[in-house]
Amino acid sequence: MLQKISQSISLCNGDQFKPLIYLAGAPTNFISSPLSGKKKSSSLRIKRIQQLQSTLEDRINPPLVCGTVSPRLSVPDHILKPLYVESSKVPEISSELQIPDSIGIVKMKKACELAARVLDYAGTLVRPFVTTDEIDKAVHQMVIEFGAYPSPLGYGGFPKSVCTSVNECMFHGIPDSRPLQNGDIINIDVAVYLDGYHGDTSKTFLCGDVNGSLKQLVKVTEECLEKGISVCKDGASFKQIGKIISEHAAKYGYNMERFIGHGVGTVLHSEPLIYLHSNYDYELEYMIEGQTFTLEPILTIGTTEFVTWPDKWTIVTADGGPAAQFEHTILITTTGAEILTISS
């Protein structure tokens, strides 16, 4: 799950923006500096623009609009709830690294496996005419049946148990009465709180007959996540993640959203804040055995500029271009990384 934006956004200098708060997991208290590094080749830029134009021209579905949001669902009293549920304020990001002990790792794995199972189930519901509200209700019911709490519910006032982000929605989509349509893509972001630990994962699903350009965007985004995980191990630099993800996205002319992954464990969002774009100059940090965190790249065909809807959660691309995202929670080992959010 991603972190709520709580500051206004100013768009400037083409496709650059300078938010005071970054979203993918945790806020930072600085204004971004201009992008640096090598620019994409003109051929890739032209290809990307042409692909976006073609995608929008071939689009059979209208732009995303807000539907009706149903009342918040209840959770049985016996289910353990995160502390933030009692407050509408977005929790502070914990500065404590998430390094569970042996008992904690067992609990963490159970939470992550449940999140993965719930996500797999949610994916089976993706088809034309199903509403995202129906998906939310199904996810909510499955989570509480397993004695867990749906982590998004009540996080900073978020009204639903899952995030459903369709087409140009980059993240934080609130489930509502809008039915899915043939040709849509939808990211479903599931996080659960079980026995004191959070598991966090997401995937972009295809709804019906999806055109080739969207299929490729989804495929490359998933590959970016896999490549990011492939460089993770004890002692590795976090900067390697952004470098390999950005390089793979650039090969296809996609824009890499400049948001961040985060530590996860007994709290939903903690240090380290993991930049998934190679152009950030920040203090060098290294991974530690036993550490748990998420990686969650977001790719767009067009701009990474975005617009926040009046609900203060839903984030859509400014040009209406599609976006895709994938996310896993991983555990750092001496030789690599164990993906925890995989269902057995």
UniProtKB/Swiss-Prot annotation:
Co-factor binding comment: Binds 2 divalent metal cations per subunit. Has a high-affinity and a low affinity metal-binding site. The true nature of the physiological cofactor is under debate. The enzyme is active with cobalt, zinc, manganese or divalent iron ions. Most likely, methionine aminopeptidases function as mononuclear Fe(2+)-metalloproteases under physiological conditions, and the catalytically relevant metal-binding site has been assigned to the histidine-containing high-affinity site.
The keyword Plastid is annotated on this UniProt entry: yes
CC annotations in GO: chloroplast; mitochondrion
CDD domains: MetAP1 (cd01086)
Binding-site list for a divalent metal cation 1: D189, D200, E327
Binding residue positions for a divalent metal cation 2: D200, H262, E296, E327
One function term, GO molecular function aspect: initiator methionyl aminopeptidase activity
EC code(s) of this entry: 3.4.11.18
InterPro entries cross-referenced by the UniProt entry: Creatinase/aminopeptidase-like, Pept_M24, Pept_M24_MAP, Pept_M24A_MAP1
EC category: hydrolase
One biological process term in Gene Ontology: proteolysis
Essential cofactor(s): Co(2+); Zn(2+); Mn(2+); Fe(2+)
Tissue specificity note: Ubiquitous.
Binding site for substrate: H172, H269
Keywords: Aminopeptidase, Chloroplast, Hydrolase, Metal-binding, Mitochondrion, Plastid, Protease, Transit peptide
Catalytic activity: Release of N-terminal amino acids, preferentially methionine, from peptides and arylamides
Subcellular locations according to the entry: Plastid, Chloroplast; Mitochondrion
Family to which this protein belongs: Belongs to the peptidase M24A family. Methionine aminopeptidase type 1 subfamily.
NCBIfam families named in the record: met_pdase_I
Function summary: Removes the N-terminal methionine from nascent proteins. The N-terminal methionine is often cleaved when the second residue in the primary sequence is small and uncharged (Met-Ala-, Cys, Gly, Pro, Ser, Thr, or Val).
Name of this chain's protein: Methionine aminopeptidase 1C, chloroplastic/mitochondrial
Native source species: Arabidopsis thaliana (Mouse-ear cress)
Biological classification of the source: Eukaryota, Viridiplantae, Streptophyta, Embryophyta, Tracheophyta
Name of the coding gene: MAP1C
